[in-house]
From Swiss-Prot:
Chain positions of site Cleavage: 98-99
Disulfide bonds: 272-282, 281-340, 309-372, 313-374
The name this protein goes by in its record: Growth/differentiation factor 8
PANTHER family assigned to the protein according to its UniProt record, in alphabetical order: GROWTH_DIFFERENTIATION FACTOR 8, TGF-BETA FAMILY
Residues of the signal peptide: 1-18
Organism: Antilocapra americana (Pronghorn)
Main localisation: secreted
Length: 375
């Protein structure tokens, strides 16, 4: 009993020396600590966002197999961009992001872009294949995007100038060949007859899939084609070499190639906004603006929602590998902590100019963060 009294006396003496406890001070310190934590989280998210934007630039160039961004001016784009139905449909009905679940988790995506449509503009043929020293329209060069994919569709698009009176137009597509003994330089590909009424000019498409497939099998046979569209008076209405005011009316090839479907896989994760106080791993919104990059060579989309992952990954939040939580409990010093990373990503469709001034419509995988998790 005497010992207990001594202990109580010592305890009371310590309280007197220490003075009264300020509960408000402790509360203020806690509040300041929380504010500091939130500021640090905001700063971390801002750094993560900046890093994500820079990574997207690098990824796009890499996935499109471009060493640098194509140097194409806005004026050049206006001249090269065809004013044609298939391109307008791609832009008007543009599907920037697919919300379906057909594209699965990150590990199921291929790295490089999948080409779906290639729009190839004509180039001038070399002197050896020109007839009588004059370039004949049109010569098309094909990139590996066409050569190493299955061609599903190939259409030659030509623009016919307007007529003043109703007339019948005879369209003929000729393939340039090596000179034969009788001097023949052409062989027919397709011919058709169509009626035109007064008014605006029209775009006409012609199936050239068989010819394209032959060219891909035997590239040396690709010497070019000639286009004729004669009215009843023998006037050629086809725009092969555009005159002033005819920008965007060049002939071109629209080639569609096969795409490979991907497997799907569902995942779960948190969604947050920029004002969220969530400290755990979460998906945050991020819009990529290609015009802000100065990337005029991307026709569409001009911007898209990429999103990014940020937040803490304590082992209790671990989603992808639950067994790691048990490992950490057994050996907390010997196991590395999880990171907040994308666990599900989806592609974007993109319409762009490549380095050869060809218009490509394709799918770039793993460009949109759909889910974030700790792994």
């Amino acid at each position: 009993m005497q010992k207990l009294q001594i202990y109580v006396y010592i305890y009371l003496s310590m309280l007197i020396v220490a003075g009264p406890v300020d509960l408000n001070e402790n509360s203020e310190q806690k509040e300041n600590g929380e504010k500091e934590g939130l500021c640090n989280a905001c700063l971390w998210r801002q750094n993560t966002k900046s890093s994500r934007l820079e990574a997207i630039k690098i990824q796009i160039l890499s996935k499109l197999r471009l060493e640098t961004a194509p140097n194409i001016s806005k004026d050049a784009i206006r001249q090269l961009l065809p004013k044609a139905p298939p391109l307008r449909e791609l832009i008007d009905q543009y599907d920037v992001q697919r919300d379906d679940s057909s594209d699965g988790s990150l590990e199921d995506d291929d790295y490089h872009a999948t080409t779906e449509t290639v729009i190839t503009m004509p180039t001038e043929s070399d002197l050896l294949t020109q007839v009588e020293g004059k370039p004949k329209c049109c010569f098309f060069q094909f990139s590996s995007k066409i050569q190493y994919n299955k061609v599903v569709k190939a259409q030659l698009w030509i623009y016919l100038r307007p007529v003043k009176t109703p007339t019948t137009v005879f369209v003929q597509i000729l393939r340039l060949i090596k000179p034969m003994k009788d001097g023949t330089r052409y062989t027919g590909i397709r011919s058709l007859k169509l009626d035109m009424n007064p008014g605006a000019g029209i775009w006409q498409s012609i199936d050239v899939k068989t010819v394209l497939q032959n060219w891909l099998k035997q590239p040396e046979s690709n010497l070019g084609i000639e286009i004729k569209a004669l009215d009843e008076n023998g006037h050629d209405l086809a725009v092969t070499f555009p005159e002033p005011g005819e920008d965007g009316l060049n002939p071109f090839l629209e080639v569609k190639v096969a795409d490979t479907p991907k497997r799907s896989r569902r995942d779960f994760g948190l969604d947050c906004d920029e004002h969220s106080t969530e400290s755990r791993c979460c998906r945050y919104p991020l819009t990529v603006d290609f015009e802000a990059f100065g990337w005029d060579w991307i026709i569409a989309p001009k911007r898209y929602k990429a999103n990014y992952c940020s937040g803490e990954c304590e082992f209790v939040f671990l989603q992808k590998y639950p067994h790691t939580h048990l490992v950490h409990q057994a050996n907390p010093r010997g196991s590395a902590g999880p990171c907040c990373t994308p666990t599900k990503m989806s592609p974007i469709n993109m319409l762009y100019f490549n380095g050869k001034e060809q218009i490509i419509y394709g799918k770039i995988p793993a460009m949109v963060v759909d889910r974030c998790g700790c792994s």
